[in-house]
């Protein structure tokens, strides 16, 4: 009973805050199509991801979520999806053009695109053409504030991410018996990073956090040298690094921390990069320790275990993460809606997506539903920590499979 009570209290706390803020198929490496089979006629799904450019590593990782969907969708008795892949090249205008091209080639539903700027462009095209669009990953709030009828997001907005990040940070601090008193906030200057910066100013004061931000440093996510930024952060003498980053820059920043011999008490990330498989494998023991407060999955859910098993078979040694989970769930939503709509008619599909009620899912929270704006407002974030090349969920307690290690082990003492 006590565990159930704690769980309910956690959901209520997070919901109260948000209320105030507004394979059976065969893949060919160069083939434009693959069939994710279930049963019945195939729904043509255009999947847009950044598979080249500086977000290529993440886009390619998201593709794994597409590639492992087949067996699970088949087990659920869902109809097949004909996947039409497109590379956004980490470029907003290319994303827009590729979305138009996919629709012209017969795509009946779109999925993508990881990046908020690219997803915003695709949303405009989808709404104009009247084609349902399910966002896998993108947090900029305006996307679901435009009154769109064909756009749906199964991913939290920046304020939702921050809400859960601060709730989970406090849980981690309490479990560790220690907390930073000061932090430097470093963020990418793209659409997502800018939205998160704005969100912090609005959200953080509501949580009475134990630390204050003493410096804010913005930088280009495509930068190849971040030595000046780390030097500036180190000079503040802050206890912790509060991060909103991407993959390549997370690797650069870590190498720079090592080079400049600075190990903060904690690295508290509220975005991608630090939990990526490429980050873990590239940096080895130097990747241990960062805490990521991000949209995640509940490792205790049945479907999470199915997804982990499917990924382990398709990509041995790769840890299940946000990229796979939310890309898979976008396809789960599409297949479920198609089955209920019984039609490829765009309006019927959109209405079916709108009335989604999936309780057996992967991400943390009570399931997948959309509000009047097309936003899943019931998603709950988690806290994960890199440990020995693995990712442990350390908060919230209801979804945890490990306890946090604190503080960050000095980089020069790792052998």
Task: For each feature predicted by the language model, list its residue ranges.
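Extracytosolic ligand-binding ectodomains
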Residues: 2-5, 12-20, 29-415
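Hydrophobic core
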Residues: 25-27
